């Protein structure tokens, strides 16, 4: 029965989850929601998994992104981080952010939100922020929120230049 059910689900383009995976995700979400600042970001959001489409002004390239959280022009990005090696601790997260170029992602997403809001004639907040909501992947699922303000556009252009070289 189970194999047939899994095959049926997969044929429909769905992915079955194990109960252990569901429990794991719920435990991480519960720890994140316990942060008072996270509650403000998550509960007051305008949307989750919001898709944005725009054309980059400088290069004329069509762009898209999918925001985890959009809250009155503010962006929230969920990050699951490995607990070993420092996990959600500030210095460890900074190292991970640098190595994985999270700053470029943040700048790219900010450009997208700014372009979409401008197109829709929606005013942006005066102080624009990008927040990473970080949760470790092992119990006790330590959490943190890190914020950058007014992401420099130059980081987006660095991404485009690097992409053009490929």
Give a label for each model feature.
Residues 1-66:
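Metal-dependent nuclease catalytic cores that hydrolyze phosphodiester bonds in DNA/RNA
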Residues 37-42, 71-77, 114-126:
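Secondary-structure boundary elements
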Residues 61, 70, 101:
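Short, contiguous, pocket-lining structural segments
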Residues 96-103, 108-166:
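Metal-dependent nuclease catalytic regions and adjoining charged, substrate-binding loops involved
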